[in-house]
Amino acid sequence: MPDHTPPPSGLDGAGLLVVDKAGGVTSHDVVSACRKALRTRRVGHAGTLDPMATGVLVLGVERATKILGLLSLTTKEYTATIRLGAATTTDDAEGDVVSRGDVSGVPDSAIDDGVAALTGDIEQVPSSVSAIKIDGRRAHALVREGETVVIPPRPVTVSRFEVLQRRRSADAIDLDVHVECSSGTYVRALARDLGAALDTGGHLTALRRTRVGPFTLEHARTLDELRADPRVSLDIDAAVATAFPRRDVSAAEAESLSQGRWLDPVGIPGVYAAVGPDGRTVALVQERGKRAGSVMVVRPATLGP
């Protein structure tokens, strides 16, 4: 029987959806599935995740799509498995092997030294199969067409790179690792560079993102769980409370913000949530000079109750 339930309007259904992405599907596939499950076209993602990777993918639904660009998602955490003993064209298991190295003489101490050298503030050359654009085209598309891609190094911060477990075989060493890093860091490039430093070659065989900014696997649901219970993970007020500092405002101040007017600043840095006496977010606000103005009005006066 067809579903004749009307799609959400206003702030109904608005919020953030934190998906635990399965392997083998693209971020665009996830967006499409969420649009179908939630019966709305207004779904967007706050950054992608490689098809082979699993884990946290943050999406905005309905009016919450407007806050995606304001989210501070500058730190990320991953668990991964690095295989030493072979380098591949894609720096992961989906690529062709381009070289192999002998791992029999590699001591644990050398691995530890290599990991330490890739921890902290480093210059990293992104993977050649990344989504970075070169002369207007994605690097991964150029690589698939057989072109040689040279991407300049860029500064990243790897605040944690820890080996959790090691497994040795005749032709490989598998390392289960935990990585905490800045946005723009490529874990597959860490695998590549560790293998290069040890002269063994290295690539990823598994990657799972466990956190993006304040959003973790505890917030996340699989697509099957979403289909069974189609709702956002965090409504717009809960999403804002999780992601932004809070400023409580009076009813009069809330009305001013809802009408696009500014308030006096109170010295809160960055973007923060202005919350009215009813506990609902009125606007996301940023202070500039002598004004605290809205960067997004969550509940404009025209929206109604």
Model-derived segments and their meaning:
Residues M1-H45, L49, A53, V115, ...:
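Accessory RNA 3′-end/elbow-binding domains used by RNA modification enzymes
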Residues T88, G120, Q165-A170, V212, ...:
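Short, conserved beta-turn/loop elements at beta-strand boundaries and strand-helix junctions
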Residues R42-S72, S128, A141, E145:
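Glycine/acidic-rich beta-strand-loop module
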Residues K36-L38, V58, V149-A191, A196-D199:
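The conserved catalytic core of RNA pseudouridine synthases
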Residues A64, G69-P126:
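Acidic, low-complexity central loop/insert segments
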Residues S130, I134-P153:
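Extended alpha-helical targeting/anchoring segments
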Residues L59, A80, G136, L190, ...:
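Residue-level signal for inorganic ion chemistry
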Residues D121-P126, P153, R188, T200-A206:
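Short, structured loop/turn "capping" segments at alpha-beta junctions
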